[in-house]
């Protein structure tokens, strides 16, 4: 019988209370992990003004992003709150806040089969 994980419900205070982790060795880039399993992950990414994530690709996962606040350049488009981006696996991209006041982005890495 398959084990079912319990649902996760977080208020805005609960999200704010999550551990803020640096993303690799990048200055000005942090994230909070909301949920993860063996092949997928959801979280909140913060890129401070004047910083960028750096060009990279996710070899095995689709990347979904929804801009929550602020602005950033993603795939060459200047995106603000409410904007959504889907990046298929293998596509190089960046999250660039070097010319904006920074941004907060909800992200989901999803395995192609999931």
Regions from the PLM with identified roles:
Residues 1-39:
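A short, N-terminal "cap"/entry segment at the start of jelly-roll beta-barrel domains
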Residues 59-74:
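Glycine- and acidic-residue-biased ligand/ion/polar-headgroup-sensing regions
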Residues 48-50, 73, 110:
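Solvent-exposed residues in well-ordered beta-strands and their adjoining turns
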Residues 43-47, 68-70, 105:
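Short, well-ordered beta-strand segments in beta-rich or mixed alpha/beta enzyme
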Residues 26-31, 35-58, 78, 88-92:
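Conserved short histidine dyad/triad with adjacent acidic residue
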Residues 35, 66, 86, 96-98:
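Well-ordered beta-strand positions
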Residues 61, 78-80, 89-114:
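Ligand-binding loop in jelly-roll beta-barrel domains
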């Amino acid at each position: 019988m398959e084990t079912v994980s319990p649902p996760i419900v977080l208020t805005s205070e609960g999200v704010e209370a999550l551990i803020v982790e640096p993303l690799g060795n990048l200055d000005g880039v942090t994230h909070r992990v909301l949920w993860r399993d063996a092949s997928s992950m959801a979280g909140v990414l913060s890129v401070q003004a004047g910083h960028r994530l750096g060009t990279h690709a996710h070899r095995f996962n689709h990347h979904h992003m929804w801009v929550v606040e602020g602005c950033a350049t993603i795939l060459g488009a200047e995106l603000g709150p409410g904007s959504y981006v889907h990046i298929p696996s293998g596509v190089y991209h960046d999250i660039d806040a070097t010319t904006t006041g920074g941004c907060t982005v909800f992200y989901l890495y999803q395995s192609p089969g999931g």
